[in-house]
């Protein structure tokens, strides 16, 4: 694991052993949204919510970037304003029975939609709707609530 100094939004941030740039960003106290990243699983990088821009203008998912000494990134540039649209696209194809969902009140999708000011969805739901699989006594799987995290 690498060790060094990164610059995040102009802030000098030391790192020592963090496995990706996302971990360094969070260590710096910056709230970086993610849907598909879980530290104990392999990196997928599909949700595109944790995108950052480096000093050369390259955009990449911070969860899949290794921290490097001297790396300079920005977390909130004009080119990174796509997060709101990603949320709208997820909500367009998402089952909207929030009041009966067990995650209501602690749902990351709800929290981020509120945080990014998504009040209405401009896109049509074009995905097929699936039956709920409640064949297991322990797990109920509702594929209509999938957020395509991987």
Stretches found by the model and what they are:
Residues 11-69, 81-82:
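N-terminal cofactor/phosphate-binding cores enriched in small/glycine residues
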Residues 1-11:
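Eukaryote-biased recognition of intrinsically disordered, low-complexity regulatory segments
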Residues 48-150:
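Fe-S ferredoxin-like electron-transfer domains
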